[in-house]
Amino acid sequence: SGSESGSGCGRWAATACVVTGASRGFGRSLARLLAPRLGRGSLLVLLARSAEPLAALATELRGDGGPGDDGGPGDDGAPGLRVRCVAADLGSEEGLRRAAAALRELLPAPHYGRLLLVNNAGSLGDISKSFLDLTDPDEINSYFAFNVTSALSLTSTALQAFGKRPGSSRTVVNISSLCALKPFKNWALYCSGKASRDMMFQVLALEEPDVRVLNYAPGPLDTDMQLLARTKTGDPGMRQHFQSLKESRNLIDCTVSAQKLVNLLEEDTFRSGAHVDFYDI
């Protein structure tokens, strides 16, 4: 069954797509771009902590008067697309278990020929603190539970649940950062979390050559995270750096960066496990 009418509709036949951190910022922009590309019989799973913005996004993506979470065809941009919301705090064991259970329930359906998992959920940590201020193991462990553990656990769960299918394609995207490659003052947690995730997904690419793996650094985005960076970072030089990015209008609109990621996925020529930055493309 080939492509359907409409702009981009049906380009990706029967895809199971999962986006974490989908309620705002880059994740929301990406979900809005992906939905019209997902053809009949596709599933879009939106994962985030906050239920209300997720539900609002799901309603928008289905089209007004679209179906409930249990599927059926939507009215507008994505005919035949099921949208499921999973509200879960991925930093807690209970939330991670709930998210994993949803993936185990939804992904094994045999008609999906493609899996796309986008690990976008993440946080900055307390960037007012220097390295020497980070003495509380509970604070450190909770940061890595959300930013590293959940990405590893959900990715392995999703790949296991989807399984290996003849002729199918499986793609895993990690939303990375320049901070995975370069240290920044006061950002010990964020930089080490991003570096850890990049390496983790490089190992996945090595172990599973049939899975396409991409570490995509979206550039400095005009989001709430950037607002925190320029107001809360402990180091004055770093605060000034982020302030000047805003003042010189060098922050990137989320939709512009998300579109570059979609282009990368559609071209599908990246080396598996590669770190690709917005400015490389």
Question: PLM features: residue spans?
Answer:
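The beta1-alpha1 cofactor-binding region of Rossmann-like NAD(H)/NADP(H)-dependent oxidoreductases
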Residues: 51-52, 87-102, 137
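Conserved glycine-rich cofactor-binding loop
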Residues: 21-24
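Conserved glycine-rich Rossmann-like NAD(P)H-binding loop of the short-chain dehydrogenase/reductase
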Residues: 39-57
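Rossmann-fold cofactor-recognition segment
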Residues: 61-66, 75-94
